[in-house]
Amino acid sequence: LASHIPLEKIETIYLDYHSRSSVMLTRVLAKKFWKINVKWTDATEGFESRIKENEAAVIIGDKALVAEKNFPYVYDLAEEWIKHTGLPFVFAAWVTNRNLGETFKNEFNSALKYGITHIDDMVKNTNFSYLPSHISAKDYLTRNIDYLLDDNKTKGLNLFLKLAGEIN
């Protein structure tokens, strides 16, 4: 969440259209933990450059890395979640409601393991020139993203789903 002012002074929050999980996390944080009541506005292309003094915006992905330098107040949503709950936040996961069979699970887990253990190769062979110069692609992919869904992350996910259900 990026803003020119502190949380308690924000009147409007623009919601990035690229991530429903980040949008809902922001709504949960605002209602349950930050205790702020704001106007929610769906963002449109280029919204990051139109944020006024009493506004904030959920900015995700690579755009968030750039936004860090343009706003005096930047709240990392995952860090805010951890600060208030003590649990990690799960932004995305592979899920299904049908049985895919052991063959698929084994192949998927093998591909995931291969990807995780070959991040160095991927970084060498991919153009990350769009990242700000102070961001290392390898660091971003190995420190900012955790690829395994463990019990603690499942607890965090379940708490998030419960709280999201309460505010909807």
Regions found by a protein language model. Name each.
Residues 42-126:
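Pocket-lining segment of extracytoplasmic ligand-binding domains
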